[in-house]
């Protein structure tokens, strides 16, 4: 029963389950029964896998948004990572709904006239979605934390990660520095929205970045 109903939301539960599966495989190894051999071939699937949907902002904010929104609206346990470059990177750096207001990119040479679509806010409005932003170059411990929390949440999870791109116009050798500046300037605030905190009577919103200390240039 422990093998079938093991709690594997946290790392300790997964480690315990690996131990149970190892014991099961040891016992099955001594049997020549076809059913035992069949079970041994699939026993490792009793260990919970970490599965993520990964896509860029062109997919998440624009051409694939309808499907993404449908998934987030449902109560299923699914993890989604959006790598947000704020432009259509694969096709040369054109303006997208992820591009912030005033930004210069292809198709908005005079500066984008409309605001960036707030994907994280839209997702958090559902109330049952775990939502977080991340920028590992600015705060790697926060990035690790949001992945851990998203993985452990029994429902839809969305992480929107700031992703430097050559279309931004700087040498990619400095991508971590650019992430740091994006957070320090307030361009990319780091936060978490965890519905579990609301269920416990607390505030589900946690701001992980400090007040802006750098100008936006």
Show where each model-derived region lies.
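Short intrinsically disordered, low-complexity coil segments enriched in acidic
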Residues: 1-8, 75, 174-179
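An acidic, phosphate/nucleotide-engaging active-site surface
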Residues: 20-29, 37-40, 119-128, 134
């Amino acid at each position: 029963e422990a093998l079938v109903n093991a709690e594997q939301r946290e790392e300790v539960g997964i480690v315990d389950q690996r131990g149970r599966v190892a014991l099961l495989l040891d016992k099955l190894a001594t049997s020549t029964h076809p059913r035992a051999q069949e079970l041994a071939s699939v026993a490792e699937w009793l260990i919970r896998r970490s599965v993520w949907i990964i896509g860029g902002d062109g997919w998440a904010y624009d051409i694939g948004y309808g499907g993404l929104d449908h998934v987030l609206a449902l109560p299923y346990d699914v993890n989604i990572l959006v790598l947000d470059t704020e432009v259509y990177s694969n096709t040369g750096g054109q303006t997208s709904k992820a591009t912030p207001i005033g930004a210069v990119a292809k198709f908005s040479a005079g500066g984008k006239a409309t605001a960036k679509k707030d994907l994280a806010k839209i997702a958090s409005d559902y109330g049952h979605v775990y939502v977080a932003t991340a920028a590992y170059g600015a705060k790697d411990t926060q990035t690790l934390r949001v992945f851990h929390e998203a993985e452990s949440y029994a429902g839809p999870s969305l992480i929107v990660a700031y992703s430097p791109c050559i279309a931004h116009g700087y040498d990619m050798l400095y991508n971590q520095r650019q992430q740091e500046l994006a957070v320090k300037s307030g361009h990319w605030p780091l936060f978490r929205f965890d519905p579990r905190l609301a269920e416990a009577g607390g505030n589900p919103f946690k701001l992980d970045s400090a007040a802006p200390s750098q100008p936006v240039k």
